[in-house]
Amino acid sequence: MSESIPSLSALKVANSKPVVRVGIVTRNRARILPKAIQSAFSQSYPNVEVAVLDDGSDDGTSTLRSDFSAVQWQRWESSRGYLEARNHLMRTASADYYLSLDDDAWFLEGDEVALAIAYMEHHPRVGGLAFDILSPDRPNRAARSAPRPTSMFIGCGHVVRISALRECGFYAPSPGLYGSEEKDLCLRLLDGRWDIHRLPGVHVWHDKTSVARDQADQHRSGVCNDLVFALRRCPLPLILAILPVKMMSHLRFAARTHLLKPCVEGFGLFLRHALSVWQSRNPVRRETFAEFLRRSREA
């Protein structure tokens, strides 16, 4: 580990090493999934278990079982969505930590898990830890530097403390199948006085494969769920300003990226569910939301 990260390089994991479950939800990505699995098993940290949940694949993913017999394989015959699948992997874990890795994401070195767990063991109120995500649209590595607070982690590469999840709750379902679930969970963790930190330069590569991705559908869902997130968690009277600002921001982005149709459809999906979301509102404390916004601006 680089000497530029004394807060990490000086740490020692306790003799009784915590168990880490690396959870991978997959659907119809049999060609790229092995790279994610291999990168998890290549980690230097000794107490890693790898669990793969096949969410209704029909591309031969199940044939990989014989190649990776050490994996804890589970399969759903019909797809229930990645959010329910991730919740299942976290709820059924007997591990101390859950590491979320996408089926098209992988580690670049061999020490990422060891560094993450050492840091979280040394900082017992850190409930979630974000890796530094690289992707085809952000390919350049950064030097490893001191961990720092952040607003949220991304689903393709992060670690969460199982005890914090059991206290604050798992992913909350939304009308859309994609978007804002990590933001919602991180906000609730912060409201429960857990912290979210980031490891700059400790990278996970997210390949963002186009297989099983529908850009318009993801945008529609993402717009809806972002508005649901605001309605569900934003305290009064701030919600009266946040919702219109978010809608205008989504419209401007959609106009620039030629996604106006799915954006408007996302508004419609949100409006159809707005009453039920309002009735189940559970906003966080004002100071929590203000801190979340401050960290988001600094990210």
Ranges and model annotations:
Residues 1-39:
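N-proximal low-complexity "stem/linker" segments adjacent to membrane-targeting elements
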Residues 38-47:
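Short, acidic, metal-binding catalytic loop of nucleotide-sugar glycosyltransferases
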Residues 39, 54-63, 105-106:
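A conserved acidic beta->alpha catalytic loop
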Residues 76-93:
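Glycine-rich, basic loop-to-helix element that forms the pyrophosphate-binding segment
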Residues 98:
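Short aromatic/hydrophobic "clamp" motif used to bind/position activated sugar donors
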Residues 106-142:
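Conserved donor NDP-sugar-binding/catalytic core segment of glycosyltransferases
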Residues 158-160, 164-169, 175-203:
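A short, conserved alpha-helix in the catalytic core of glycosyltransferases
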Residues 221, 236-299:
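Non-catalytic, C-terminal membrane-associated alpha-helical segments of glycosyltransferases
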